[in-house]
Amino acid sequence: MQIPIAQPRAGEEEIAAVTRVLRSGMLAQGPEVAAFEEKFARYCEARHAIAVNNGTAALHAALASAGIGAGDEVIVPSFSFIATATCVSMCGARPVFADVDPDYFTIDPESAHALFTRSTKAVIGVHLFGQPFDVDPIRELCLDHNAILIEDAAQAHGSVYKGKKVGGLGKAGCFSFYPTKNMTTGEGGMVTTNDADYAAKIRRFINHGQSEKYLHTSFGYNYRMTDIGAAIGSAQLKKLDGFNKRRLHNADYYDRHLKRTRIVLPARRKDCTHVFHQYVVRVTKEFSLTREQLMQDLKAKGIGTAVHYPIPIHRQPVYQSADTSCPVALELSSEVMSLPVHPLVTDEQLKYICDTVNEVI
């Protein structure tokens, strides 16, 4: 039995959508993108959605269109995918690294609070692995310091924080549609916002700074999504709640059948909906095997695993700084391990994975 750590799920609907676009002759950005944006904004309970060609572009566009630039600081969690920080550097600003909560792995409000300076212009909170960060205290800090809040929702399509979908809780929400995500467009991303003027700036930024054809009123990039990607996205969006329901089913199964092991299972924040982009456990020093030994044993049995993430961002060579301390992020990076939780994992495979984990330990 071979069980991959991630596997995109696409069917006849996606194939038909791509075929429809190919037959239309509109292969770049056109009506499919506009339709997908409208549907995604409605799904996220946001007023505007702007489609882009990847999640990093979404973050870059959100920051740059908010005026973030040279001399500014943006607080980001160190335990995340590196794009959470590089989007800041792409604007000429400086990422400042906050530590994370040891239970939920998301940005620690107390750590973030200590990092605010006169140069702080934004905070990027990451809804990591499908779990919302604690938005209220971070949003309050931003209001107190006249900073904006950006949601990195690349892994959290459909997550809910205190009754509200993520993506509409700050200045902007930034999503990724990479093939391993909860829904995909192949490659792609989206920015959601409730600010019409800001949305217009983002639209110019992702289209060479054009306010109308061949009239360039600001600097910008080509971050446009194609109609092919958007057509796939519309088909996937119809299935997203079903995908997330299956992910939750799989996570619940793990919770029930691995609770007697000494592996630390993922905690779930109250009043929130976790959509389990990843099911991330901790293999601590108290465990009988090292994380690497456990991963090798599972690999030998055909079970895919992964480490998200082995090096915290503040320890990456491009950002390594002696004056940055994020001890929780550093500890997590040495302990975390992801198990397959995607919608194509069957009950039979779940049983096999749990039986194997219990056997090897």
Describe these PLM feature segments:
Residues 1-26, 31, 340:
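N-terminal "arm"/small-domain region of PLP-dependent enzymes with the aminotransferase-like
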Residues 26-73, 87-91, 97-99, 164:
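Phosphate-binding glycine-rich loop
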Residues 34-38, 46-49, 110, 122-126, ...:
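PLP-dependent aminotransferase class I/II
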Residues 50, 75, 96, 148-150, ...:
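Structural detector of well-ordered beta-strand residues that form the stable sheet scaffold
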Residues 64-153, 160:
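PLP-dependent aminotransferase-like
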Residues 151-184, 212-217, 264:
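Conserved active-site segment immediately N-terminal to the catalytic lysine
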Residues 168-204, 210, 227-230:
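Active-site PLP attachment segment
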